[in-house]
A protein has these predicted regions:
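Short connector loops/turns at beta-strand edges and beta->alpha or beta->beta junctions
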Residues: 1-4, 30-34, 164
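Glycine-rich phosphate/pyrophosphate-binding loop regions near the starts of catalytic domains
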Residues: 1-18
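Metallocofactor- and cofactor-centric catalytic cores in central/energy metabolism, strongly enriched
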Residues: 15, 46-47
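Histidine-anchored nucleotide/phosphate-binding helix
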Residues: 17-31
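Short amphipathic, charge-patterned alpha-helical segments
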Residues: 24-28, 174-190
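Short internal beta-strands
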Residues: 36-43
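Hydrophobic alpha-helical positions that pack around
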Residues: 49-175, 187
Length: 190
Protein backbone atom coordinates (compact mmCIF):
# COMPACT_ATOMS: atom_id res chain seq x y z
CA UNK A 1 0.00 0.00 0.00
CA UNK A 2 1.52 3.28 -1.08
CA UNK A 3 -0.09 5.55 1.49
CA UNK A 4 2.31 8.40 0.76
CA UNK A 5 0.11 11.11 -0.84
CA UNK A 6 2.58 11.78 -3.67
CA UNK A 7 3.21 8.14 -4.57
CA UNK A 8 1.26 6.55 -7.38
CA UNK A 9 3.67 4.07 -8.93
CA UNK A 10 1.80 0.92 -7.92
CA UNK A 11 -1.56 2.37 -8.90
CA UNK A 12 -0.18 3.24 -12.33
CA UNK A 13 1.03 -0.33 -12.90
CA UNK A 14 -2.29 -1.80 -11.77
CA UNK A 15 -4.19 0.59 -14.03
CA UNK A 16 -1.89 0.13 -17.02
CA UNK A 17 -0.80 -3.52 -16.91
CA UNK A 18 -2.61 -5.60 -14.29
CA UNK A 19 -1.86 -8.75 -16.30
CA UNK A 20 1.85 -8.45 -15.46
CA UNK A 21 1.00 -8.61 -11.75
CA UNK A 22 -1.29 -11.60 -12.20
CA UNK A 23 1.36 -13.39 -14.26
CA UNK A 24 4.06 -12.63 -11.69
CA UNK A 25 1.90 -13.78 -8.78
CA UNK A 26 1.11 -17.05 -10.54
CA UNK A 27 4.81 -17.59 -11.26
CA UNK A 28 5.69 -16.87 -7.63
CA UNK A 29 2.88 -19.11 -6.42
CA UNK A 30 4.19 -21.94 -8.57
CA UNK A 31 7.76 -21.35 -7.38
CA UNK A 32 6.91 -21.49 -3.68
CA UNK A 33 4.04 -23.98 -3.81
CA UNK A 34 1.28 -21.52 -2.94
CA UNK A 35 -2.26 -21.88 -4.24
CA UNK A 36 -3.59 -18.44 -3.36
CA UNK A 37 -2.43 -14.87 -3.77
CA UNK A 38 -3.84 -11.68 -2.32
CA UNK A 39 -3.67 -8.21 -3.83
CA UNK A 40 -3.98 -5.48 -1.23
CA UNK A 41 -5.23 -2.36 -2.97
CA UNK A 42 -6.47 0.99 -1.75
CA UNK A 43 -10.23 1.40 -2.05
CA UNK A 44 -9.43 4.93 -3.27
CA UNK A 45 -8.11 3.49 -6.56
CA UNK A 46 -11.36 2.69 -8.43
CA UNK A 47 -9.80 2.52 -11.90
CA UNK A 48 -7.03 0.19 -10.72
CA UNK A 49 -9.61 -2.01 -8.99
CA UNK A 50 -11.83 -2.12 -12.08
CA UNK A 51 -8.97 -3.03 -14.40
CA UNK A 52 -7.56 -5.61 -11.99
CA UNK A 53 -10.98 -7.27 -11.70
CA UNK A 54 -11.30 -7.40 -15.50
CA UNK A 55 -7.79 -8.85 -15.83
CA UNK A 56 -8.52 -11.48 -13.16
CA UNK A 57 -11.67 -12.56 -15.01
CA UNK A 58 -9.76 -12.73 -18.29
CA UNK A 59 -7.01 -14.82 -16.68
CA UNK A 60 -9.65 -17.22 -15.35
CA UNK A 61 -11.38 -17.43 -18.75
CA UNK A 62 -8.09 -18.36 -20.43
CA UNK A 63 -7.22 -20.94 -17.78
CA UNK A 64 -4.33 -18.96 -16.30
CA UNK A 65 -5.93 -18.91 -12.84
CA UNK A 66 -8.07 -21.48 -11.08
CA UNK A 67 -7.85 -25.22 -10.62
CA UNK A 68 -5.41 -27.43 -12.54
CA UNK A 69 -3.91 -24.66 -14.66
CA UNK A 70 -3.11 -26.02 -18.14
CA UNK A 71 -4.13 -29.51 -16.99
CA UNK A 72 -1.38 -29.66 -14.36
CA UNK A 73 -1.42 -30.22 -10.61
CA UNK A 74 -0.94 -26.48 -10.13
CA UNK A 75 -3.93 -24.49 -8.92
CA UNK A 76 -3.72 -20.80 -8.11
CA UNK A 77 -6.23 -18.05 -7.53
CA UNK A 78 -6.00 -14.38 -6.59
CA UNK A 79 -8.27 -12.46 -4.25
CA UNK A 80 -8.50 -8.69 -3.88
CA UNK A 81 -8.32 -7.20 -0.38
CA UNK A 82 -9.21 -3.54 0.04
CA UNK A 83 -7.15 -1.20 2.17
CA UNK A 84 -7.83 2.22 3.62
CA UNK A 85 -4.59 3.79 2.45
CA UNK A 86 -2.82 4.23 5.77
CA UNK A 87 0.87 4.90 5.15
CA UNK A 88 1.90 2.44 7.86
CA UNK A 89 0.29 -0.39 5.87
CA UNK A 90 3.32 -0.32 3.61
CA UNK A 91 5.07 -2.27 6.38
CA UNK A 92 4.42 -5.96 5.81
CA UNK A 93 3.04 -6.93 9.23
CA UNK A 94 0.76 -3.86 9.29
CA UNK A 95 -0.47 -4.75 5.82
CA UNK A 96 -1.20 -8.33 6.88
CA UNK A 97 -3.12 -7.14 9.95
CA UNK A 98 -5.19 -4.80 7.78
CA UNK A 99 -6.02 -7.65 5.36
CA UNK A 100 -7.16 -9.72 8.34
CA UNK A 101 -9.57 -6.95 9.35
CA UNK A 102 -7.43 -5.76 12.25
CA UNK A 103 -5.90 -2.36 12.83
CA UNK A 104 -3.02 -1.90 10.39
CA UNK A 105 -0.23 -1.63 12.93
CA UNK A 106 3.21 -3.24 12.61
CA UNK A 107 4.34 -5.90 15.06
CA UNK A 108 7.77 -7.01 16.14
CA UNK A 109 9.46 -9.88 14.38
CA UNK A 110 10.02 -12.81 14.73
CA UNK A 111 7.89 -14.48 13.71
CA UNK A 112 8.49 -13.23 10.20
CA UNK A 113 5.57 -13.35 7.75
CA UNK A 114 7.35 -16.11 5.79
CA UNK A 115 6.91 -18.28 8.90
CA UNK A 116 3.55 -17.02 10.18
CA UNK A 117 1.74 -14.29 8.29
CA UNK A 118 -1.77 -13.93 6.90
CA UNK A 119 -4.14 -15.97 9.08
CA UNK A 120 -1.09 -17.77 10.52
CA UNK A 121 0.03 -19.16 7.15
CA UNK A 122 3.50 -18.63 5.71
CA UNK A 123 3.20 -15.41 3.71
CA UNK A 124 5.40 -13.85 1.04
CA UNK A 125 4.90 -10.08 0.72
CA UNK A 126 6.04 -8.22 -2.41
CA UNK A 127 5.15 -4.85 -3.84
CA UNK A 128 3.65 -4.22 -7.25
CA UNK A 129 6.86 -2.78 -8.72
CA UNK A 130 8.84 -5.88 -7.78
CA UNK A 131 6.19 -8.20 -9.18
CA UNK A 132 5.94 -6.23 -12.44
CA UNK A 133 9.62 -6.96 -13.11
CA UNK A 134 9.30 -10.75 -12.86
CA UNK A 135 7.75 -11.56 -16.26
CA UNK A 136 10.14 -9.31 -18.19
CA UNK A 137 13.18 -10.70 -16.36
CA UNK A 138 12.04 -14.24 -17.21
CA UNK A 139 11.47 -13.26 -20.86
CA UNK A 140 14.62 -11.16 -21.35
CA UNK A 141 16.96 -12.89 -18.91
CA UNK A 142 18.87 -11.90 -15.82
CA UNK A 143 21.87 -10.62 -17.79
CA UNK A 144 19.61 -8.20 -19.66
CA UNK A 145 18.17 -6.90 -16.38
CA UNK A 146 21.65 -6.63 -14.85
CA UNK A 147 22.72 -4.44 -17.78
CA UNK A 148 20.77 -1.61 -16.13
CA UNK A 149 22.04 0.11 -13.01
CA UNK A 150 25.28 -0.50 -11.19
CA UNK A 151 27.33 -3.57 -10.40
CA UNK A 152 25.97 -3.73 -6.84
CA UNK A 153 22.44 -2.47 -7.58
CA UNK A 154 21.20 -3.73 -10.91
CA UNK A 155 17.89 -2.99 -12.57
CA UNK A 156 15.65 0.03 -12.59
CA UNK A 157 13.56 1.98 -10.12
CA UNK A 158 10.27 3.80 -10.65
CA UNK A 159 9.76 7.17 -8.98
CA UNK A 160 6.79 9.50 -8.76
CA UNK A 161 7.83 13.10 -9.31
CA UNK A 162 5.33 15.33 -7.55
CA UNK A 163 5.20 18.57 -5.60
CA UNK A 164 7.47 21.53 -6.30
CA UNK A 165 9.14 20.17 -9.41
CA UNK A 166 8.72 21.35 -13.00
CA UNK A 167 8.06 18.00 -14.69
CA UNK A 168 5.73 15.82 -12.64
CA UNK A 169 4.86 12.22 -13.41
CA UNK A 170 6.31 8.74 -13.28
CA UNK A 171 9.86 7.97 -14.32
CA UNK A 172 11.85 4.76 -14.49
CA UNK A 173 15.59 5.14 -14.18
CA UNK A 174 18.55 2.78 -13.84
CA UNK A 175 19.62 2.08 -10.26
CA UNK A 176 22.46 4.41 -9.35
CA UNK A 177 20.85 7.44 -10.98
CA UNK A 178 21.57 10.37 -8.69
CA UNK A 179 18.93 12.48 -7.02
CA UNK A 180 20.42 15.48 -8.83
CA UNK A 181 19.78 13.76 -12.19
CA UNK A 182 16.23 12.85 -11.18
CA UNK A 183 15.34 16.36 -9.99
CA UNK A 184 17.20 18.57 -12.43
CA UNK A 185 17.71 16.60 -15.64
CA UNK A 186 14.49 14.59 -15.68
CA UNK A 187 12.28 16.65 -13.38
CA UNK A 188 13.35 19.98 -14.89
CA UNK A 189 14.37 21.43 -11.53
CA UNK A 190 12.40 23.06 -8.76
Amino acid sequence: DEGDPGAFMDRSILEGDPHSIIEAMAICGYAIGANKGLVYIRAEYPLAIKRLKIALEEAKQYGLLGDNIYNTDFSFDIEIKYGAGAFVCGEETALIHSMEGQRGEPTTKPPFPAESGYRGYPTNVNNVETLANIPIIINEGAEWYKSFGTEKSSGTKVFALAGKINNVGLIEVPMGTTLREVIYEIGGGI
